[in-house]
């Protein structure tokens, strides 16, 4: 739907659907992968248990969107500036605000993670919070993520200036860098074969971010400009295919490492009889659906777009993004979970 008065798409229903599906995914996966508190260990307050997956989802969503905004200039590279400048200005303004929100979400997640270990929950003091941030790997990772988030905001702000703009590749590189610390301090770090687990998780996170974030900016910023879509869609299709393959392969590797980490259970039983395994199966099903939607878009709809025919690109990209929202929610919960 196009709001002719503003000249911008009115995406509220779609964004609401993505948020709802992401929330459903993170809630369901958190319930499935929850483990009882060990005897003698005080359970964190309910507010902390609720806030942790929600804030992790917020951090992941902001970082993915930041990667997508960083990818956009690369999809439009080589086109005349008078055609791309209006879209890029909107993207840089969004990137400026999103970087600040990402940094804030990272700090709130840092607070929630420290509160999980503190007897007083969210009432912990600044000294306890500072100790967690300085001494715990997950705390340091969030500080790095927050710094990268602020750096992306600064880079987007600099790109709004008419002169002395930073290199086009820099925002996406910094956004990807901001994702790695959390990937390297999650459950993969505790896996038996942690080197392989960390490598596969890093590839998985970066490829998924470029794919999901790229599709989001394509849908929200490029689709309304059909003259730009003819150039950007084939480029994104090529990037998306590579990212899909990387996500699939790295996801399988990481799942195998995690599911074989408990020899007394056996990988088949771990996959079929644990909450962790069910979440992995659900993510795999979502990936299969995304592959089907992406294949239809690339081989059936894209040729029509290149011939400037009217086709429902928005519908198919919107369906992809809805499924991706569910997958991001599952991943946000899975990042904090372990095979139990």
Identify the role of each PLM range:
Residues 1-340:
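Polytopic transmembrane helical bundles with strong interfacial aromatic enrichment
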């Amino acid at each position: 739907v196009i709001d002719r008065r503003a000249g911008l798409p009115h995406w509220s229903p779609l964004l609401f659907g993505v948020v709802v599906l992401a929330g459903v995914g993170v809630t369901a996966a958190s319930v499935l992968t929850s483990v009882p508190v060990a005897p003698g260990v005080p359970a964190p307050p309910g507010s902390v248990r609720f806030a942790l997956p929600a804030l992790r989802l917020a951090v992941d969503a902001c970082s993915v969107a930041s990667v997508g905004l960083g990818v956009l200039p690369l999809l439009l590279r080589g086109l005349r500036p008078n055609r791309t400048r209006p879209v890029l200005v909107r993207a840089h303004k969004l990137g400026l605000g999103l970087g600040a929100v990402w940094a804030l979400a990272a700090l709130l997640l840092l607070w929630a993670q420290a509160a999980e270990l503190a007897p007083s929950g969210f009432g912990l003091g600044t000294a306890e919070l500072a100790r967690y941030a300085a001494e715990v790997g997950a705390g340091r990772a969030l500080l790095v993520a927050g710094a990268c988030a602020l750096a992306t905001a600064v880079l987007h702000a600099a790109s709004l200036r008419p002169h002395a703009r930073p290199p086009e590749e820099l925002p996406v590189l910094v956004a990807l860098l901001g994702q790695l610390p959390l990937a390297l301090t999650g459950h993969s770090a505790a896996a038996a074969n942690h080197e392989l687990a960390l490598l596969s998780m890093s590839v998985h996170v970066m490829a998924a971010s470029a794919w999901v974030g790229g599709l989001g900016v394509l849908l929200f910023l490029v689709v309304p400009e059909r003259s730009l879509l003819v150039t950007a869609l084939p480029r994104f299709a090529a990037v998306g295919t590579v990212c899909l393959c990387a996500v699939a392969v790295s996801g399988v590797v990481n799942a195998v490492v995690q599911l074989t980490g408990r020899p007394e259970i056996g990988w088949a039983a771990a996959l079929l009889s644990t909450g962790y395994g069910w979440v992995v199966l659900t993510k795999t099903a979502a990936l299969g659906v995304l592959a089907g939607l992406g294949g239809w878009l690339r081989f059936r709809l894209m040729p029509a777009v290149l011939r400037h025919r009217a086709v429902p690109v928005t519908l198919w990209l919107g369906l992809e993004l809805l499924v991706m929202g569910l997958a991001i929610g599952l991943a946000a919960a899975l990042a904090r979970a372990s095979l139990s």
